[in-house]
Design a protein with these regions (language model features):
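Membrane pore-forming effector domains from diverse proteins
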Residues: 1-28, 54-117
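Weak global preference for isoleucine
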Residues: 8-9, 24, 32, 42, ...
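Short, cationic, amphipathic peptide segments
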Residues: 29-57
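Intrinsic-disorder/low-complexity loop/linker signature
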Residues: 45-46, 89, 123, 171
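Long, helix-rich, hydrophobic modules that act as membrane-proximal anchors or helical bundle/coiled-coil regulators
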Residues: 94-184
Length: 184
């Protein structure tokens, strides 16, 4: 089964390329570029003082092609969300529910708070700590939009995310999404 590309709301490119390499194997046409920079002028065999290294990979297939080729394997590899316990590590799980907007702000504050995407699922809430550049066009712009455009948001989705912890006071989970796909 494949996913309609138009239904992809969020796609973490780092996660997808890492999983693609793991599941399919390295892309024989991949190009790996390493860049070093620094200001200290010291570069020993094992020690770097003030030196940074950045690695980039270029594949002969697009991230969406990678995602399509591993979709079924991702479905099989990860469990559906059923329970989570703080202080026992993170879990990568499938969650299904309604994608909406959430907001954190001080009690009684009239100023706008921190807005984020939130998943409502089985009576639970999960706040997504997301990289806005991985959102489909239009989805990242909603945060700066008028409040008149932010009502009635409830998109049915299936999401693969790393659940990191539960905030007891706020009664919600916090997760880093890897994939969010609209269900219809």
């Amino acid at each position: 089964m494949s996913v309609n590309d138009d239904k992809i709301i969020y796609l973490d490119l780092e996660f997808v390329s890492r999983k693609y390499e793991q599941k399919i194997g390295g892309d024989p046409a991949a190009t790996i570029t390493k860049q070093q920079g620094g200001n200290a002028g010291i570069n020993a065999l094992f020690a770097h003082a003030g030196v940074t290294t950045q690695e980039s990979r270029t594949f002969s297939v697009t991230s969406r092609q990678m995602f399509q080729s591993i979709w079924n394997q991702l479905i099989d590899e990860y469990d559906n969300f059923s329970e989570f316990e703080n202080y026992s590590g993170t879990k990568v799980l499938w969650l299904e529910g309604e994608l909406t907007l959430g907001e954190w702000k001080s009690s009684g504050s009239k100023e706008a708070g921190y807005q984020f995407y939130q998943l409502n699922h089985n009576g639970e809430r999960t706040a997504f700590v997301a990289n806005q550049s991985y959102l489909a066009p239009g989805f990242s712009e909603i945060f700066g939009a008028s409040s008149a455009l932010k009502g009635n948001i409830g998109i049915p989705v299936k999401c693969l995310a790393r659940v990191m912890w539960h905030v007891d006071d706020a009664k919600n989970y916090v997760a880093c999404p890897y994939v969010i796909v609209e269900q219809s």
